[in-house]
Amino acid sequence: MGIHEHVEGIKAHWAKNFSFLDYFKKVYGRDKPLPKWTDADVDEFIASDPVYGPQLKAMRESRKFALGGALVGGAHLGGIALKYSKAPHGVVLATGFGAICGAVVGSEVAEHWYQLYKTDKQGANLRFIYWWEDKVAGNQKS
């Protein structure tokens, strides 16, 4: 294996590792941002796309698990801090930390509940962005 093949292998490796930058450029690197969409627009996309629609719907429903986990975690750890510490700054910090931990645990529960590990979450979001861009531009075929 020569140096040229080695360099090409390294380029391919890092191109794969930084492929998420294409997503961020498409979503955030715009001269003129896309207008806000509503829940009705998202529901229209879910109904119109048989592949990515159900995936996007499951991802939207999984937010409830993260929110529930954040509420439970924040209330639990904040309550324990209030019971034993009674220091206001400790209660605030414990509530915040409990909410973060609860949201992470809730997200993991949702990941398995909806089997999101089998889906292409970035692809579904990007497909929705493409669809919304076409709809805003007036190129929607439905």
Curated annotation (Swiss-Prot):
Pfam families: Rick_17kDa_Anti. The keyword Hydrolase does not apply. It is a peripheral membrane protein. It comes from the Eukaryota. Signal peptide: none annotated. The keyword Cell inner membrane does not apply. Keywords: Membrane, Mitochondrion, Mitochondrion inner membrane, Tricarboxylic acid cycle. It is found in: Mitochondrion inner membrane. InterPro entries: Gly_zipper_2TM_dom, SDH6. Pathway: Carbohydrate metabolism; tricarboxylic acid cycle. One of its GO terms (biological process) is tricarboxylic acid cycle. Its main location: mitochondrion. Component of complex II composed of eight subunits in plants: four classical SDH subunits SDH1, SDH2, SDH3 and SDH4 (a flavoprotein (FP), an iron-sulfur protein (IP), and a cytochrome b composed of a large and a small subunit.), as well as four subunits unknown in mitochondria from bacteria and heterotrophic eukaryotes. This is Succinate dehydrogenase subunit 6, mitochondrial. It comes from Oryza sativa subsp. japonica. The gene is SDH6.
